[in-house]
């Protein structure tokens, strides 16, 4: 398993670009920024507390319902301009080798996205945070959090100077 682990690249990053969705770039006519923070639980559906026990296997193994759940999430995300994702999978066995941040960026027609791989367990699991945006970030910074390894924060900046917007995405668990 050690051979699958990759070094985390801390520091400044450029967003990934969905060339097909650059027309969806920018704010709507009312100039309001619509924000969403969403813990997607790797695309698992949880309707009651007992599902954390009875469906816990879905955090490790693939299952049929995940693709449909991701499509529903993608439809929901399309109503927002900036989305913070927690508990996304970066493309391991449990997600059917689908990078869920990239997939949701495509489904929601976001021109810009970034995936922060926090805990790389290779083919088994790739625990990630993500950012989806209709605005091009001027800077994206990846920061490890103190404490146990495998946690991080993404600092996303829009603009420069005193009117710049800074958004921090993280998952504390």
What positions do the PLM features span?
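N-terminal, active-site-proximal structural segment of metallo-dependent hydrolase catalytic domains
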Residues: 1-107, 118-122
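Beta-strand-turn-beta hairpins that frame and shape the catalytic cleft
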Residues: 24-35, 133-138, 149-169
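Loop/turn elements at helix/coil->beta-strand transitions in domains of secreted/extracellular proteins
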Residues: 79-82, 109-112, 163-165
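Short beta-strands and strand-loop turn motifs
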Residues: 84-87, 114, 168-170
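Generic recognition of short, well-ordered alpha-helical segments
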Residues: 95-99, 127, 142
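Conserved beta strand-loop-helix elements of the APE1-like EEP
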Residues: 106-108, 123-140
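A short, structured active-site edge motif that brings together acidic residues
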Residues: 110-123, 143-145
């Amino acid at each position: 398993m050690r051979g699958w682990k990759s070094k985390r690249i801390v520091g400044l990053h450029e967003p990934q670009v969905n060339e097909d969705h650059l027309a969806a770039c920018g704010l709507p006519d009312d100039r309001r920024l619509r924000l969403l923070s969403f813990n997607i639980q790797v695309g698992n559906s949880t309707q009651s507390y007992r599902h954390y026990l009875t469906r816990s296997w879905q955090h490790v193994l693939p299952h049929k319902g995940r693709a449909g759940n991701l499509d529903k999430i993608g439809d929901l995300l399309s109503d927002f301009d900036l989305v913070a994702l927690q508990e996304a999978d970066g493309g391991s066995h449990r997600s059917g080798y689908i990078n869920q941040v990239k997939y949701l960026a495509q489904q929601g027609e976001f021109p810009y996205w970034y995936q922060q791989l926090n805990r790389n367990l290779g083919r088994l699991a790739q625990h990630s945070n993500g950012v989806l945006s209709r605005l091009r970030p001027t800077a994206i910074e990846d920061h490890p959090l103190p404490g146990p390894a495998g946690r991080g924060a993404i600092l996303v900046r829009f603009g420069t100077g005193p009117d710049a917007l800074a958004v921090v995405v993280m998952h504390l668990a």
